[in-house]
Each structure stands twice: as C-alpha cells, then as structure tokens.
A protein has these predicted regions:
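Surface-exposed, charge/polar-rich loops and edge strands
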Residues: 1-4, 8-449
C-alpha cells in the first residue's frame, strides 16, 4: 500500500540581524550580480552579507570565486557576524513571514524548514535541469558554512487558511520593513512565534500533496544533497536533525509575478532580412505593425475603449512596453528598426502537450532552431536573454546598437503552466521564467546543527 505523500515542513530557530542592522546586512541574491558589482555594493560596509555569499570580494580583485580560501572566508565571516552580534539566532523554533511589494502588489511568503526527503522523493517538484558544477559550488558553500545562508523560492496551491493567517499578520507591525536599494521594492518580515499559528501552518502544509520550486533549483539541489550527505555520515542519525531541513520561502501560486524572458540573436544564419521574414510565414502569420489598438479609457476597471494609433504615437504616449505580446502564441519581432507581430498558425503546437504549448518552446522549435540553427540555448553564443524588468526598450537598444541583429519578445509563462509541467514530470525549456521581485538575502539564515 502506497503511503499518501504530503509536505513535511517545520519551524526552525532562524539566524537573523537585529532590527537596527537589517538594512546594513541584507543584500541581493548571490546569482543576480557579478563579483565586481558585489564589491561595489558592499563598499566599506563590513556588515554586508556579500562578505558571506560573494566571499571572493574579501580578496584581491580577480580572485576565483571557486578558490578554496574563498569558501573558507565565507565560513569565517559567518562566524564573525554571529560573534559581533550582526546575526543572532532566535531561541524558539518558529515560522516567519516575508512580504515583497512591487508596483503596488504584495506577495506574502512563509519561511519554513523544507524536508530534504520531500525533495529527494519528488514531493517538492522541480521544472528545471540543474548543472552539476553549479550544484557543487553551492554544496561547498552550504558545507563550509554549515547553513543555508540564502533561501529558495517555492510556490504552493492557494490555501484559504494560510491566506487568512498571513492577512492577520499583515495587519500588525512587521519586525523588518524597508525599501531595498537598486530594485526599489518594499520588503517586510514578521516572526510567527504563537504556538497555535505554528501548529496551523505545519498542519496546512501537511495537507498539500506537493510544493513547487519557482526559483532556486541549484540551491535546492545543493541543500538537499548536503542534508542527505550529513545523514549518511552520522552513525546516530534519527531524521530529526536540523540538516534534514533546508530553508524555503513559500508563496501562494496566484500571488507570484512571472515576467517575460526575451531573446536577442546576433545574426540571421546567413539569410537576408526578407528571406528570414519569408521563412517565418511557413509557421506564423507575420504582421507589419504600423498601428496598434490602445485602450485609452485610462480606467482599468471601466469598459475598455480601444483607439487605433500609429505605432510611434502609441510608443511616445504609453512607452514601448505597450507593444508587449498580449496573448499566448503571439510574439513580437524587432528587426531593422521595425516591429512585427508573429502569430503561430494552428497546428504548429499541441495544446495537450504541457511543453509543446509553451511560447518558449514554439519559438525555440520554429524560429531559433528551424530557421536560425540555434539548437542549444544554454551553450550557443549567438543568443542572449533579456529578463523581465528591463522591458522592450532593452531589446530595441541591443539591436539598434548593432550588437544584435534581431529581438524576439514572448508572452510570459504562467504559474499554472509551470505547475502542470512539474506535475507531468517534465522539464521547462531553458530561460523560460523570470520571477520578480527576487528574494533579498540576509533577512534570515537556517543553521544545519
């Protein structure tokens, strides 16, 4: 008889900065900036988490982030931060709430200890392939610090009980509340120390058949692998030790914002622009956009009132992003200073296939591979990717500068599509999702002992 799988999250004694230091300690996640940027952002702030998550900045510029001394320096700094009282461990096992507000929209995450075995058995579901070298780098970091310094980002199906609990806390004064530099988003943080609330959270997660990794596949893999490794090395392993859990922030799926993740390509694979446009007509309806229907009512809740405007007028009045593809299977192409609409013809995709129906897959198969000869998005140097917040202006800039020949804008993937793919055991095509806002690091840390 197969045991019904369920999620086994638990509270933990978080390690975190005192209220008055949080803005000095907190940082962006390790993988959204390079060493030079981290060095510049840390500046002369010795309390910056970058000294732990980008520890190469503690050495001469040019020092490899994979140098053994660099990992050791992360552990030394983690010890130093605790000794100096810049990070302190809570006395009680508890949950935490982390909220982010972007453009007036707030998403509320529960910070939990996720169970390593739930990851190993596939109850925590992934949708991305991980690279062994990147896993190994994160594993070394977890091992040497003996902690999950940065959280991973999970989604769960909407849950009314948890939502009510979150809203109740949202009405109270947060422990941390600040606007982050650079992204300008608001970040708030509450401690859930009430025993009844802790029991409710644990019980509600236990009813869920699965959790979904949204962002942080390499960190999840590394945390789980180190946990499993420690279990093997401990002759008195019970399954209750802290290393059996890793830190995750879990958001309701409907609250998450996924932005478009667009493509820019260096050349047309030997074709002229006319030949390329002609080749597209096999699988797409190609429309030269010289005018666009714009909702000019100005009232989001009211009846939309569309007016046809010349493309240049629409852009000057509403900004370039007014052109973004409004529907699935519609794309925007920028080539030779002009914008084109591409609409995938019926029969070029399979609505029943959770992968084949994705615009990232349609564009990869029918444009990048079939016409442009780009087979592997991860390794081909002719293509690059422009995430979400930079908008269509960045696509136009990179083509107009001559660096790239063409740009392709896609409609964003939905959270439901990600969950469908994870449920079917399939893997998303590369460079498909761009979540925003990103989690800040340094608000909370989970020790493995």
């Amino acid at each position: 008889r197969q045991r019904q799988m369920c999620i086994r999250d638990r509270p933990f004694k978080g390690v975190r900065p005192p209220k008055n230091l949080v803005e000095q300690v907190e940082s962006r996640p390790y993988d959204v900036l390079n060493s030079e940027e981290a060095r510049a952002e840390a500046g002369d702030n010795e309390k910056s988490l970058y000294h732990i998550i980008k520890p190469e900045i503690n050495f001469e510029p040019g020092t490899s982030e994979y140098d053994p001394r660099v990992y050791e320096s992360a552990a030394e700094n983690f010890r130093k931060f605790q000794e100096n009282g810049w990070l302190k461990q809570d006395d009680k096992e508890q949950y935490y709430i982390y909220a982010q507000t972007m453009n007036g929209k707030t998403q509320y995450g529960l910070v939990v200890g996720a169970y390593v075995n739930d990851y190993m058995t596939g109850v925590i579901k992934k949708h991305e392939l991980t690279r062994r070298d990147k896993e190994e780098d994160r594993m070394k970091h977890v091992r040497v610090c003996n902690a999950n310094i940065e959280p991973v980002f999970f989604a769960y199906p909407d849950n009314e009980v948890l939502n009510e609990l979150l809203m109740r806390y949202a009405a109270t004064t947060p422990e941390y509340d600040f606007i982050a530099p650079i992204d300008g988003f608001r970040h708030q943080f509450w401690v859930v120390s009430d025993d009844q609330d802790i029991a409710t959270i644990t019980a509600e997660f236990a009813k869920m058949p699965s959790l979904y990794i949204a962002d942080g596949h390499h960190r999840s893999a590394a945390a789980a692998l180190v946990g499993a490794e420690k279990a093997k090395q401990n002759p008195n392993h019970t399954g209750k030790e802290e290393y059996n859990y890793f830190m995750a922030v879990c958001f309701q799926a409907s609250q998450l914002t996924i932005l478009d993740y667009n493509r820019v390509v260096k050349d047309l694979n030997g074709l002229t622009s006319d030949q390329f446009l002609d080749a597209l007509t096999k699988n797409f309806e190609v429309i030269d956009i010289d005018a666009i229907n714009v909702n000019v009512s100005g009232d989001e809740d009211g009846i939309p009132c569309y007016e046809k405007m010349a493309i240049d007028d629409a852009i000057s009045q509403f900004g370039l992003d007014i052109l973004k593809p409004a529907d699935l299977h519609s794309f925007l192409l920028y080539l030779d200073g002009k914008w084109y609409g591409l609409f995938a013809k019926p029969g070029t995709y399979d609505d029943a296939d959770p992968i084949g129906v994705l615009d990232v897959d349609i564009s990869s198969r029918l444009i990048l591979d079939e016409i442009l000869g780009i087979k592997d998005l991860r390794s081909d140097k002719r293509i690059d990717f422009v995430g979400g917040l930079r908008g269509l202006g960045e696509l136009k800039r990179r083509v107009d500068s001559g660096e790239m020949k063409m740009a392709l804008a896609l409609h964003p993937v939905t959270m439901q599509q990600i969950m469908d793919i994870a449920d079917s055991g399939k893997i998303m095509p590369p460079k498909a999702t761009w979540f925003e806002p990103k989690l800040r690091s340094g608000l909370i840390i989970h020790k493995l002992d």
